[in-house]
Regions:
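Alpha-helical scaffold domains
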Residues: 1-212
């Protein structure tokens, strides 16, 4: 496929070595080594090409960088329903935090009412990165003007042994403390979160410099 060839044309071996250290569980052989700015540029270029539709249907991908590009392509979708469908087709194949976190569909901002039920489904998933993605979307889109205190219950009710799920819960509540202190502080004061998540939330909140 032409897209994969172009990824190899952008290869940076040293960056691949660096990225491998940041993504446990991802083999060095599966990492081409494409820097994110170059991948973003390629995604914007291919959104206008018919090959991008073929690429997102061609699952699973062989390379980590193909998955990163896939996530970046989904972030550029203009149609909400098509975006959600494509996201849900891709999520089962997401197997690391970097690919999960690179997905940030811009179209979601304009469809908050339709998005929330999907977020609830994703958070309830047993798949690590589907759950993580759901919480990240809740954090990105519902801690500001569209905030409701009840939304904090969604991540608070997730109890997991998975590191990348628990890190996301901590990240969510550290952000909630910065943006919605009055609603979020009770979860800390009342010990509502699992011990590890509780401690990590406090650590991340302090490190963010948004809370003193």
């Amino acid at each position: 496929m032409q897209i994969t060839k172009q990824l190899f044309d952008l290869q940076d071996e040293k960056y691949g070595d660096f990225q491998c250290k940041l993504t446990p569980g991802v083999s060095r052989e599966s990492i081409i080594g494409v820097r994110i700015p170059a991948a973003r540029k390629l995604a914007k270029q291919y959104m206008k090409e018919a090959e991008s539709a073929e690429f997102v249907r061609d699952l699973p991908h062989k390379y980590y960088d193909e998955n990163m590009l896939h996530g970046l392509l989904l972030s550029e979708y203009k149609n909400f329903d098509k975006c959600v469908k494509a996201v849900e087709e891709f999520l089962p194949y997401v197997d690391n935090w970097a690919v999960c976190d690179i997905m940030s569909p811009k179209v979601f901002k304009k469809h908050k009412d339709e998005l929330l039920p999907k977020i609830k489904e994703w958070i309830a998933s047993d798949h690590v990165y589907t759950c993580r993605f759901g919480m990240e979307m809740l954090m990105c889109h519902y801690l500001d003007d569209d905030f409701r205190a009840e939304y904090l219950e969604l991540p608070a009710n997730v109890h997991s042994e998975e590191y990348y799920v628990n890190m996301m819960i901590a990240w969510f509540f550290a952000t909630a403390l910065a943006k919605q202190w009055d609603a979020a502080i009770g979860y800390i004061e009342q010990g509502r979160l699992d011990t590890w998540v509780h401690n990590k939330t406090i650590q991340k909140a302090r490190e963010s410099y948004r809370i003193t």
